[in-house]
């Protein structure tokens, strides 16, 4: 379960929302971390179909270590390469990348690639030990936007929205979003290359209008589209009075 914030501000009479673009697609991350059965070519094909063209090229043209370093933004000598996850993920990668069936899956998928960029969404993340829901949402929001806690005000009178769906791995996911507004006019969102928590997860960040938000959410994220529409209606009808 993840907790996040749908944050808005009013600029020149128009509501705008903070959206972040993931650094990597969920499918790419799942593949790099070895979250698959290495003999299940159908599921691997499904993962590949949800990757961007650049991610597919990366798998074909780079060693596992290079991909791992890129994914976690770490040096080639990082000690985490001795972890169980690294060893198991590398073993699976080496197995499938040397299988011509897998290589052909990527090449055929590249021809019909529908995903030109990583997905956009609202800042969110998972709780730390003994962290409550709203504190998690605020911390993740601040890490991913570089805003401060006192830059925003949570609308505590509005019940949080729940995005519940089954992922491509058939696992049920639940994202909980609070509504918040910007209370400091000079607050700025930006990418900080020195903030590891942000650069590992975020590729881009923008303020977007209602129409732009809808155009940035991928068509298969039906639940995200619906909760955003509901949130926008409540903000328009109740919070701007």
Label the model's feature ranges.
Residues 3-7:
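Short beta-strand scaffold segments in enzyme catalytic cores
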């Amino acid at each position: 379960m993840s907790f996040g914030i749908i944050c808005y501000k009013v600029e020149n009479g128009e509501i705008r929302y903070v959206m972040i673009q993931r650094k990597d697609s969920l499918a790419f991350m799942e593949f790099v971390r070895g979250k698959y059965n290495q003999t299940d070519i159908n599921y691997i094909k499904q993962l590949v179909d949800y990757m961007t063209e650049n991610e597919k090229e990366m798998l074909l043209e780079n060693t596992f270590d290079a991909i791992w370093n890129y994914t976690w933004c770490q040096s080639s000598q990082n000690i985490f390469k001795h972890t169980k996850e690294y060893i198991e993920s590398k073993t699976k990668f080496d197995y499938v990348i040397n299988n011509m069936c897998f290589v052909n899956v990527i090449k055929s998928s590249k021809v019909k690639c529908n995903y030109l960029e990583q997905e956009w969404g609202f800042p969110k993340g998972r709780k730390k030990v003994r962290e409550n829901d709203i504190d998690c949402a605020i911390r993740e929001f601040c890490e991913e936007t570089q805003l401060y806690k006192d830059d925003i005000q949570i609308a505590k009178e509005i019940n949080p929205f729940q995005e519940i769906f089954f992922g491509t791995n058939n696992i049920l996911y639940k994202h909980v979003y609070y509504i918040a507004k910007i209370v400091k006019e000079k607050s700025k969102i930006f990418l900080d290359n020195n903030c590891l928590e942000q650069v590992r997860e975020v590729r881009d960040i923008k303020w977007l209008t209602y129409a732009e938000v809808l155009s940035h959410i991928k068509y298969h994220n039906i639940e995200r589209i619906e909760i955003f529409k509901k949130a926008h209606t409540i903000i328009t009808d109740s919070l701007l009075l």
